[in-house]
Amino acid sequence: MSRETAIANAERYFDEGGYKADLSRRVAMKTESQNPDRGPELAEYLTGEMVPTLEKLGFTCRILHHPRAKGPFLIAERIEDPKATTVFGYGHGDVIRGLEPQWREGLSPWALVEDGERWYGRGTADNKGQHSINIGALAAVLKARGKLGFNAKYLIEMGEETGSPGLREVCEANKALFKADVLIASDGPRLSAERPTLFLGSRGAFNFDLEIDARPGGHHSGNWGGLISNPGLQLAHAIACIAGPTGQIRVPEWVPAELPASVRRALADCEVDGGSDGPQIEPEWGEPGLTPSERVFGWSSFEVLAYRTGNPDNPVNAIPPKAWARCQLRFVVGVDPANILPALRRHLDRHGFPMVKLAASREEIFHATRLDPEHPWVNFAVDSLKRTTNAKPAVLPNLGGSLPNDIFSDVLGLPTVWVPHSYPSCSQHAPNEHILPAIAREGLRLMAGLYWDIGEKGAPRS
């Protein structure tokens, strides 16, 4: 009974095909939460797949529902000693739409396909592959020790890809059931494929629409050009006053007052790397005076996700009556999400664009969160991962993307430590989503070591 035995068990689970078999079965389940017809599949992932898996590990399981949720929730718990440390785990079994016609020839979103150093399939990276690693690591520790040495609770939701509707309410209504000492979970990418990573929160995400509706229909550009406004041109200028030509945000309330010293220290040795097939980082893009890692992990960013005016598929010589854009602000701690649209309204009005209508494009907002990089649980996890790999992991104060971490940190009051098992070029929301088996195997080793250390040492002292 040793740490090395637990890690060897995790390696064997991978090497003998257990992990691949489990993930293949889970990828084949078409759990598209953005598809209203997939309700039965969302439920079956929990009742037919997760419940039997966790019950074999000694967990008691219950299914929870909420009227706002796209699918059910599973809460599983294994209580070994009420006085022991309790670790809260999280994952989501839903995926985005499969986008079947867009996948490369020979691939399918609903089949795990091995091709070279990649395993393809929807959910391999986000998030079936990741929570499968953590559950496999729990099993490896149980096999080695006969117990975990701590209490474990695991929440799996089926609506994360639609903004986790109902998750906040379920957590608020079940605080006693969900009570724990720390959240340890996995989602998102590492800093790079080669470097194990911890992140301690996430940027917030707010999606909204800009629209100009000038008149009922289009008018001939020869007869009316120079006489009536062009909404497409006006909206382009409105967007240009929101962010400069290199992406620098011009709405003061959308950026933090400062980059905290502890965040800057944590990011000092973090080099952003998208891998050989990722896009080239453009050094002049974004907030001036910040490093690439500070721009994506320490600052806000504004994006235009879609833009429409006229008839792009069949342009005609007419001044369009309308223009529309779907935009997004990724924001960090220090930006008030309730002030995002009011601040933009004031900004556009000051710059002469009162005709631009604003509307949030989805009800749910992912709020920004960030655990102090020098928190005792962070130091504990860093030491554990370093012990397993003999190398210091990257520590990101928050993920560049967004996830419902604020529910765990603010509603449940948990310190949050995430250990991602994907990498930046995994195509997680695109065709050809994949996981790197080398990272999956290392992830099993890392998590088995981390769970072993928690069972051996308990919660770190403040």
For each of these PLM feature ranges, what is it?
Residues 2-124, 143-150, 327:
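Acidic/His- and Gly-rich active-site-bordering loop/insert found
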Residues 28, 55, 143-146, 175-176, ...:
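Generic secondary-structure signature for well-ordered alpha-helical cores
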Residues 59, 82-84, 192-193, 248-314, ...:
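An extended, acidic, His-containing surface patch that forms the Zn2+-binding/catalytic region
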Residues 89, 113-163, 208-212, 224-246, ...:
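Alpha-helical metal-binding/catalytic segments enriched in His/Glu/Asp
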Residues 93-95, 118, 155-164, 186-190, ...:
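Acidic, glycine-rich active-site loops and adjacent beta-strand->loop/helix elements
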Residues 123-201, 459-462:
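Acidic/histidine-rich catalytic neighborhood of metal-dependent amide-processing enzymes
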Residues 197-213, 417-422:
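Flexible glycine/proline-rich, aromatic-decorated loop/lid segments
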Residues 219-228, 313-316:
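A short glycine-threonine-serine/GTX helix/turn-capping micro-motif
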